[in-house]
C-alpha cells in the first residue's frame, strides 16, 4: 500500500524564508537514526504528548496544536504547497516559534508517521482527546477508534463485490473529525486483501478547520485517496476543498469518472428493462 514518507518535513518552509531559519543540527539527525518500526504505537503516543507539552510553553496548548496541524497539512497539500499564499501562511506560523520549537515540530511529525506506519488507527484524534483540547461548545468529541472499527465492520459487507464491479469503493463522512471512521473502513479493506490506496475514495467534511486539517494529515500519510472539505454540511457552505496526495498519484479523478459512467449505464439498462 502507498504511504507517504516526509523525512524532510518543513524543509520547504525553511527555504521559503521563515523569520528564524532553522539549521539542522547533529542531535536532530541522530534522533531520526532510530528505525521507526522499533517504536510502538504506545511509545510514540507517550513521546508525542511529552514533547508537545515541552514545546512553546509560553503559548496556549490549543494554539500550539492548531499551528502544528496547520503546518503539517499545508506541507502535505501538494496542490498548494508551493503557492505564495501557503508560503506566507507557513512563514507567519513559524515566526511565532524559536528554533528548538521548530525542531520539536519535526520530531512530533516523525512520531506521528511512526505510529501510523505501525498500524491503521486514529493516532492524532486520540492525542487530541488525551490532551483535552476538544471544544464543548462545538460538541467536539472524537469517538474511540475501537467503536469506529466496530461501526466500519457493519458497513463493509459486500465490499469485494463492489470493488470487482465498480473498481473502487466510496465512503462519505459529513462530520469526519480526524477521519477515524474512514481509517477504520480502510483497515477493513486491508483485512479483506483490498488495497485502499487503489480502491477506496473517501469524501470528508468538517466545520472545524483544525479537525479538517487532522483528517487531511492522517488520510494523506496513510495513503487514502480523499476529498477533505472544510465547511458546514447542514448549510452547504464550504470554505476549502483539498485532495490527498494519493488522489493525484493514483489518478482517482479518472477512476471516479469511470465509476459514474458505469453507474449511469447500469441505471439506463435497468430503466430499459423495466420499460420492456
Feature names for model-found ranges:
Residues 117-122, 185-191, 215-226, 259-276:
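Generic hydrophobic segment detector
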Residues 29, 105-109, 213-217:
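Charged/polar, low-hydrophobicity segments characteristic of intrinsically disordered regions
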Residues 2-17, 21-22, 26-193, 234, ...:
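Class I S-adenosyl-L-methionine
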Residues 145-247:
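Conserved S-adenosyl-L-methionine
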